[in-house]
Amino acid sequence: MPPKAAEKKPSTGGKAPAGKAPAEKKEAGKKTAAAATGDKKKRGKTRKETYSSYIYKVLKQVHPDTGISTRAMSILNSFVNDIFERVATEASKLAAYNKKSTISSREIQTSVRLILPGELAKHAVSEGTKAVTKYSSSAK
């Protein structure tokens, strides 16, 4: 005859009975406290790199009295990451088509022309050329 529902013992799933669990936790807590004091190295907080500071600087150059919300900054950061990835991928494909192992400014410029539409591509190319020229002259 099968046991009644009230008579069934709850399955512990291979764990210790509930009565002994607090004592084990205390011991484990003491061990971790001792280990944290000097045995193991603490992990630092992982840094997440964003374009937030650069976006903020550009915003202040264009509109000094305007602020930006955290959500808007997050959206702009995602946008910059997306465009960067698209340009890098396209430049990589162009270098592979031309059997080159190095991505140069020429591949970047061509990929920008392919990805961005019309007038936006022209402005991006001119600003990029200006930035590269400024960098080259200051590096000498």
Curated annotation (Swiss-Prot):
What is one term from the GO cellular component aspect held by the record? nucleosome
SUPFAM superfamilies assigned: Histone-fold
Annotated Basic and acidic residues bias = 1-10
Q: How is it modified after translation?
A: Monoubiquitinated by the ubc2-bre1 complex to form H2BK123ub1. H2BK123ub1 gives a specific tag for epigenetic transcriptional activation and is also prerequisite for H3K4me and H3K79me formation. H2BK123ub1 also modulates the formation of double-strand breaks during meiosis and is a prerequisite for DNA-damage checkpoint activation.
> According to the UniProt entry, where is the signal peptide?
none
Chief location bin: nucleus
Where are the N6-acetyllysine residues found in this chain? K8, K9, K15, K25
The subcellular localization recorded is: Nucleus; Chromosome
Q: Which UniProt keywords apply?
A: Acetylation, Chromosome, DNA-binding, Isopeptide bond, Nucleosome core, Nucleus, Ubl conjugation
Listed Low complexity bias regions? 11-21
Any idea which GO molecular function terms this record carries? DNA binding; protein heterodimerization activity; structural constituent of chromatin
Could you tell me which Pfam families the record lists for this protein? Histone (PF00125)
Here the cross-link named Glycyl lysine isopeptide (Lys-Gly) (interchain with G-Cter in ubiquitin) sits at K134
Q: Where is this region: Disordered?
A: 1-48
**Listed SMART domains:** H2B (SM00427)
Family, similarity comment: Belongs to the histone H2B family.
Self-association state and partner proteins as the record states: The nucleosome is a histone octamer containing two molecules each of H2A, H2B, H3 and H4 assembled in one H3-H4 heterotetramer and two H2A-H2B heterodimers. The octamer wraps approximately 147 bp of DNA.
Protein function? Core component of nucleosome. Nucleosomes wrap and compact DNA into chromatin, limiting DNA accessibility to the cellular machineries which require DNA as a template. Histones thereby play a central role in transcription regulation, DNA repair, DNA replication and chromosomal stability. DNA accessibility is regulated via a complex set of post-translational modifications of histones, also called histone code, and nucleosome remodeling.
What protein name applies here? Histone H2B
The species this protein belongs to is: Neosartorya fischeri (strain ATCC 1020 / DSM 3700 / CBS 544.65 / FGSC A1164 / JCM 1740 / NRRL 181 / WB 181)
Q: What taxonomic classification does the UniProt entry list for its organism? A: Eukaryota, Fungi, Dikarya, Ascomycota, Pezizomycotina
